[in-house]
């Protein structure tokens, strides 16, 4: 399956993509795709890094250089509220982070790469497309293999 040009990482996928053993995959991903991050995803990532006593000011500058950080725009806030209200009517509750991350992916017309696609299942009917992180990594590895042949 060809991957779309635009992707969005949720916070756990972002953390995993920035682990040492994913360095090459991350480099290829950044070279081949426009990677969007919700500002809420950035916040969660920086919280994890601050917990590990990292220099989050410097890390934030790096994130701004390599990713398209999407602020909580009016359109995203309104769409997220509509989605959440619809889910609440169906007695489905999701974390605000997940709703905003998913809405950001919908807004940017990008594939949401996540370690846990089931979390986002109720939002798929609003136009969200998801892919498990492990499948995305395999697809990127295949892209690299094909280029080497």
Swiss-Prot record:
Cofactor(s) required, per the database record: Mg(2+)
EC assignment: 3.1.-.-
Annotated positions binding Mg(2+): 10, 98
Cross-referenced InterPro entries: PIN-like_dom_sf, PINc/VapC_TA_RNase, VapC_family, VapV_Thermo
Sorted UniProt keywords: Hydrolase, Magnesium, Metal-binding, Nuclease, Toxin-antitoxin system
The protein's name in its UniProt record: Ribonuclease VapC4
Species per Swiss-Prot/TrEMBL record: Pyrococcus horikoshii (strain ATCC 700860 / DSM 12428 / JCM 9974 / NBRC 100139 / OT-3)
GO molecular function, one term: magnesium ion binding
UniProt domain PINc: residue ranges: 8-125
Biological classification of the source: Archaea, Methanobacteriati, Methanobacteriota, Thermococci, Thermococcales
Domain of life where this protein originates: Archaea
């Amino acid at each position: 399956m060809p991957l779309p040009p635009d992707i969005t990482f949720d916070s756990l996928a972002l953390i995993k993509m920035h682990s040492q053993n994913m360095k090459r995959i991350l480099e290829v991903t950044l070279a081949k795709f426009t990677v969007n991050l919700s500002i809420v995803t950035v916040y969660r990532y920086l919280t994890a890094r601050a917990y590990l006593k990292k220099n989050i000011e410097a890390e934030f500058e790096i994130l701004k250089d390599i990713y398209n950080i999407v602020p909580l725009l009016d359109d995203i806030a309104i769409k997220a509220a509509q989605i959440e209200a619809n889910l609440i009517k169906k007695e489905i509750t999701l974390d605000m982070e997940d709703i905003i991350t998913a809405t950001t992916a919908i807004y940017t017309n990008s594939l949401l790469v996540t370690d846990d696609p089931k979390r986002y299942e109720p939002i798929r009917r609003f136009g969200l497309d998801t892919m498990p992180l492990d499948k995305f990594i395999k697809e990127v590895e295949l892209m690299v293999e094909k280029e080497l042949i």
